Amino acid sequence: MEKKQLTQKEELKQQFIDRLQLDCSVSPDEASDSQIYQVLSAMMVQRLKHMRQHFVNKTNSIGGKKVYYLSMEFLMGRSLKTTLYNLELVDDVTSILNDYHININQIYEQEPDAGLGNGGLGRLAACYMDGMATDGVRGTGYSIRYEHGIFKQKIVEG
């Protein structure tokens, strides 16, 4: 007997249910918005890691170089929403959540501010990182992690 090939949406839904059960011991109907956010984020991280490994292997095989980008801040925006959009999964995930009467916008709201910047420099750095990803350039962004949140800059007698 042949095993039925699942669609991308069916696979995602099964992963979602399984991860909620394994990681949080709840069903989708019982899960809090925070638990759903954590599970969806973990699912996307796993997908991105697989894609990254494939990309790294490919660039290494052709002798590709790597860019290291240093900035005081990165204003990346909401990672879950951006990742779902970039992986073309917004419609599937929205539909899966709708099956359980869950509003995806409430899940997006669970994401904490990364605290990596608040100005034009941070937005520019994020655009450079997006551009590298879009163009297939292997790169990593480095910044300072502030212990007490985003800093304020003030020029005194200058």
Model-derived regions, located:
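A conserved ligand/cofactor-binding region detector
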Residues: 1-158
